[in-house]
């Protein structure tokens, strides 16, 4: 019976599709051609009715690797049909910068999917929301809040340093004992975000903290899976375990975040700003008072504040902790890099204090190593897809309205035309001949995206990665436990490129065994 029901649904959908078949076939023929009259479209993968190019995308390769490999046959800019959606893949920095910077507003849209609608209350966040007056007002409000509760201020540095100290205490207690650092790094980064957003931090075993970890894992695990329901939304009528888990996890997240926001609203006096939620409430209040007509027109609601905090947790914790895990993995593979970072810390910071954010301008090799981690293992190898809000072009090719544009950051960061031996981990590529920091040795280096859709948390992420790594390496040498293999550097594609689990031995450096710093 279930099979018959499925067939009936499929036939119904196919017949509905046939109504538009002539128009769609003509459109796909034009898109699949290199040129048609005066219009030139990117070369396209073969496509079939209903399923599009799915049969040609089903190889057992992660999407970023598959898209990179397809360049050999289709060029650095090509297209395919994902069901009924026209998708363009960008694999070079010239086209990527045109999309992100030169034509950022034109390609500023976001695709609506079943999964992201559940995750964002129908697009009320910043990362996945479509480009619109509401989105612009929302982003401006968040930027105002971040400035108010300052990126780069003493407050944020103190928060990160406190968690770095706590992390170092944990490593000290596990000296010479194999430790999976992943949970500790996640805990440290999560506490930074909790302190930033709610003026709260959690200890191990705290029930509320464990709830956060549980729903975060549920969201990450389900969103990471290839979901046919995002290609064929009508599949929602069938039981879907992953969607059920996602809905449950999002409900748990929203319940906790709403509780925190309500507590802040009750205590908020309009003047004192203790954390980011207070800053968001004040920024929203200020903008409504100063631009009452604008705020009413854009329809900014409390849901937008809740989703902003959800964005910060969802993106801020997963991405930053993953960068740190990759950094540790590569330092284990390249102990000479770890040693050079430690030597730089010894000379330029010394043993009488801990690293500060202001040291970034003198710790050139440390910063270069972090940049190389971001290059060789971009946390988000495929940036969140963009959508063309009107017909436009990329290079010499015409791009139709509503086309989805995917920037393959992996290809940009491993382009042999831009990087010498791109698969080799080499911090020196971010240094000049005098050992000074080169911030962007190639226009292909775009770890946080660019333009109007650039990651809002870029500054915070860079601060966290720098302070956590420099604090750890100042005091400890990281080694692979005896008999264990080196960490796997392939990773697993998902919401981010996940590091496969591995263990570390953190040895307190000899010079630090008799040193105590008064903070």
Swiss-Prot record:
Record InterPro entries: Cyt_P450 (IPR001128), Cyt_P450_CS (IPR017972), Cyt_P450_E_grp-I (IPR002401), Cyt_P450_sf (IPR036396)
Cofactor dependency: heme
Main location: membrane
Entry GO CC: membrane
Pathway linked to the protein: Lipid metabolism; steroid biosynthesis
Cellular localization per UniProt: Membrane
Pfam families reported for this sequence: p450
Gene Ontology molecular-function annotations: heme binding; iron ion binding; lyase activity; steroid 17-alpha-monooxygenase activity
Keyword terms, alphabetized: Heme, Iron, Lipid metabolism, Lyase, Membrane, Metal-binding, Monooxygenase, Oxidoreductase, Steroidogenesis
Function: Conversion of pregnenolone and progesterone to their 17-alpha-hydroxylated products and subsequently to dehydroepiandrosterone (DHEA) and androstenedione. Catalyzes both the 17-alpha-hydroxylation and the 17,20-lyase reaction.
Protein name (record): Steroid 17-alpha-hydroxylase/17,20 lyase
Lineage of the species this protein comes from: Eukaryota, Metazoa, Chordata, Craniata, Vertebrata
